[in-house]
Amino acid sequence: MCRTPRGGKTPHRVRGEATVSSREGRTMRRWLVALALAGTATVALGGCVQPHRADGDLIDDWPPLSAPRLFVPATDACLPRITPVVQAGTYETVECARSHLAEAVHVGMFTGATAGGTRPEPGSPALRTARAECDQRAREAIGGDWHAARLTLNIALPSVTGWLSGARWYRCDLSETDSIDNTRPVNRVGSLRGALVSDNPLVHRCFDPKLIGNNLNYMAPVLCTEPHRAEFVGVYVERDMSWAVFTRSSQQVHRRCMGLIAAFADVPNNSDLPYRAGSIFYPPSQREWEEGDRGVRCFLWSDDRRLTRSMRGVGPKGLPAI
């Protein structure tokens, strides 16, 4: 049974500026005032003492001004708040051992045409290259696909002022979420690095879906040894298409998920498969989709019997066609 309404829900997603503080500039102004006063004194004493001739170059002995340094946020840092735009004046990090909302797993740089134009807007297709890089860096940091866990990935950008001043960075922020249905980031303690290398409660496993009529209300996580009707089987990457086309492609998504279910349970992907299980799927939000996220989460769905074990590798006898 294809539970396409699971994909119809759009959960809430929460997703810098250059400052130049020049002490040299203030010192320079003092020196200019001092030189002006010295010149006045020289003129006043001109009738009495032969003035010392200047060398003609008023600035040859001044230290050169250092180039303005653009603000770039730190990577491998944890953040007490999440904002799609980072202001240098309000930028703040905390130790990952303390409570925080996100972890910056990478800071990259825009290049090419994107870097030469106006600043990309959050949720725009101009962020596709950045999101692809963020996705790969997140995988490297946590040891697996973040879609397979209670995690969400957001991109932070410089302010428009920072962009106009030359900032071309983007930051990849990874956060723990409350559940697969509520993807609002929640506070956590500890770094996410290596989180998916070993067994971790963040990873999606078994669920007992709660329905209202034929529509999914939410997915309650349970132990796989407890009675349940759904289990996470994996993620597939959807082909490139518009959001409008994707929302009309539930049957195609269902077929792709059924292929993952067959591989997960080690059963044939044939005409008997719909009599063994159905699918539930969670796509990216529209904003994530527009930025280039194509990861669709797939779940095995057992609508006619409760399961009390994982269906991973059970074969045709463990997941019979009925």
Residue ranges and their predicted role:
Residues 45-47:
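C-terminal motif of bacterial Sec signal peptides marking the signal peptidase cleavage site
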Residues 49-322:
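Primary mode marks residue(s) on the alpha4-beta5-alpha5 output face of response regulator receiver
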Residues 7-8, 16, 25, 39, ...:
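Residue-identity detector for glycine
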Residues 21-38:
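N-terminal export and membrane-targeting signals
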